[in-house]
UniProtKB/Swiss-Prot annotation:
It comes from the Eukaryota. GO terms for molecular function: ATP binding; ATP hydrolysis activity; ATPase-coupled arsenite transmembrane transporter activity. It is an enzyme of class 3 (hydrolase). Residues 7-18 have a biased composition (Low complexity). Its EC number is 3.6.-.-. InterPro entries: Anion-transp_ATPase-like_dom, ATPase_ArsA/GET3, ATPase_ArsA/GET3_euk, P-loop_NTPase. This is ATPase ASNA1 homolog. It is found in: Cytoplasm; Endoplasmic reticulum. It comes from Plasmodium falciparum (isolate 3D7). GO terms for cellular component: GET complex; membrane.
Amino acid sequence: MSEDESNSVSCSLSLESDGYSDEEYDTNLNKLIENESLNWIFVGGKGGVGKTTTSCSIAVQLSKRRESVLLLSTDPAHNTSDAFNQKFTNQPTLINSFDNLYCMEIDTNYSENTAFKLNKKEMFDNILPELLHSFPGIDEALCFAELMQSIKNMKYSVIVFDTAPTGHTLRLLAFPDLLKKALGYLINIREKLKGTLNVLKNFTNNEMEFDSLYEKINHLNAMSSSIQANFQNPMKTTFVCVCIPEFLSVYETERLIQELTKKNISCYNIVVNQVVFPLDSPNVNLENCKNLLSQIKNEQIQSYFNDLISKTEELEDVYISRRKLQSKYLTQIKNLYSNDFHIVCMPQLKNEIRGLNNISSFSEMLLQSKDIPIYKDNL
């Protein structure tokens, strides 16, 4: 990650813009969970970094404080069902053991069943798809528009989005700009061809169809503006970045934060998963053990303990190497973001996070402050 890239992160996404003072950069998610003004919380990052675990855990904590919570998966992989060991569909389903936490998994692939679906039997209706498809990605933007409009009308206190990997998520967040551009293009065409359209309306005796068409255009334009306003309101919407201390993940997190900055979308929390923390080492010196072994005459005992010491040294080397490697990227994360973000380091666990008990335990750890564990050789 270059210095120019690092310096390009805008202060507009910092804690200061969300009402936090310089002394409140806690290394936990308490302020996120306690912020009752938020309606939409997006959780995103590179694939395989623990987005679903993090979003599920955030939703569990929110369910303790909010009247109703919806966990909504837009990731085609739909790992939320696996996380809770419960099948979810495209309809809100109450999660087992909760009375106010729901989950749904939706397919964001383009469907013809959008608000812009037209009757292809009518002459003028055939023109619109050609115009729309001249904008790459407009079909996906239309689907996102319908999705976000339906979500906007849902009566939940807060919605947590378990998003797809970064590229797909950025397209979701960018759809208002693309849609407004395409619709603006159509509106301009209408103004330029107003006289011709009036002739066509008289010729086809189809005035209601023309008016209905542009009513749809104006409706979608207003809807896009409304959703974009929600995206850019830090009191209503925020983004939680999830990463692991590895090069590709840290680089993609930086790219994501820069894109969020450009779109004026609030982001003041970073969760770093799979972090190897220092161990509480026993007071044992391996060299002393070797010296003691040399005094033991029984060769069988010597062989057994020599093998044990050798394996212990190998494990220690792997552990230290891993700590040093992670510390390189944890140092970058700390230098880049510690002045503007809550950075929450979550430990590498021996078991996968599946089932309500494990998710609940993980969610509690998100609220516990932990120093960023930089290996001493990297200080």
